[in-house]
Amino acid sequence: MAHRTWGGRFGEGPDALAARFNASLAFDRALWREDLWQNRVHARMLHAVGLLSAEELEAILKGLDRIEEEIEAGTFPWREELEDVHMNLEARLTELVGPPGGKLHTARSRNDQVATDLRLYLRGAIDELLALLLALRRVLVREAEKHLDPLYVLPGYTHLQRAQPVLLAHWFLAYYEMLKRDAGRLEDAKERLNESPLGAAALAGTGFPIDRHFTARELGFKAPMRNSLDAVASRDFALEVLSALNIGMLHLSRMAEELILYSTEEFGFVEVPDAFATGSSIMPQKKNPDILELIRAKAGRVLGAFVGLSAVVKGLPLAYNKDLQEDKEPLLDALATYRDSLRLLAALLPGLKWRRERMWRAAEGGYTLATELADYLAEKGLPFREAHHVVGRLVRRLVEEGRALKDLTLEELQAHHPLFAEDALPLLRLETAIHRRRSYGGTAPEAVRERLEEAKKEVGLD
């Protein structure tokens, strides 16, 4: 039997395996709400330009309402042999209302139809992600404020070696800044994708007297796309969203990695809540940060989606090719992965138990205050490079002797350089070092509090 959608050209039906391979219903049925919305608007436009009678429009709209009720109730008869969500809805509409259902596809192709559905879907998905990003940013702000008084200090790292002490609040706000940019990228992507492909038809437009501005306006797009080839052939809007999701997941992965490290016995800075950890089937003592590990791993999954779709579109000639069917699975999966990761971190972070004394001791160790001594000599007039060497030699001696910076006496400091005076000794205390980093964007409490107050206003917590 010939295919009901395009069977006129063919003398026999498709191979069974080929038909299953060709079908996309398993994943594009997620677009059913957008397809119904588009169908309603397209039908009203066809009526407005005289291509549907009032009676035909009424029948179509009632049929679409019935279909929506069936899908919501779980009684809609999805049929894989109809390939995709578009043909399933159209076939059911025709069953319900007869010939008017077959008129709905006038002046439209599945090429512009699916491109329109996908843009509509992404608009809604981005709005959901922006709300989740806002919620997580609020969590980060609250956690920063909670750990600012009393001061929670941890070692800052470069090359994963202890470098200089920083406030835990400063650490939280670092991720706040990353997530703020992530939200901006999604907002930018939404702005660019908000143009309507509907009416481009297969690739060349249509001879019917349609009103593309009508459908664009009714669907909430800012305008119709200006080139019919571009409208059906381009997936850069999907790639841009995937790029934003990829960067966002990279940031969540970095946070997860740090928390995994900090929760080990070797660091011992933090304990992960029981609700977000698992045990071992053989080792009774284990508490594994599985959720954080999965967020870290799933960042690779989203990166794979971005790379995969890039590979799909890189060599496609204009206009539509079936290759573009491969845009939805990675995109929908990446959206769900990022959404769930945001929700999980927003729930996990407030339950973290930070070990203030352990962090403080670690921040004091590792010669993290050596830079304070080099800065001191530079402030006294010694060229910084020379000051760097002086303190470097001092640290080497302490390492050899197994001593800490805070053990130094004034006499020992002066033995390394005569510019050291009594006022250098407070620099060997963690509190002094933290308060000295008061440059704009620095880790001093007053600098962090200033940024915290700004961040609270940005997320509506003022």
From Swiss-Prot:
**Entry's CDD domains?**
Argininosuccinate_lyase
InterPro entries in UniProt: Arg_succ_lyase_C, Argininosuccinate_lyase, Fumarase/histidase_N, Fumarate_lyase_CS, Fumarate_lyase_fam, Fumarate_lyase_N, L-Aspartase-like
Q: Which family does it belong to?
A: Belongs to the lyase 1 family. Argininosuccinate lyase subfamily.
The catalysed reaction is: 2-(N(omega)-L-arginino)succinate = fumarate + L-arginine
Its taxonomic placement starts with: Bacteria, Thermotogati, Deinococcota, Deinococci, Thermales
What's the gene? argH
This chain's protein is named Argininosuccinate lyase
Q: Which GO terms describe its biological process?
A: arginine biosynthetic process via ornithine; L-arginine biosynthetic process
- CC annotations in GO: cytosol
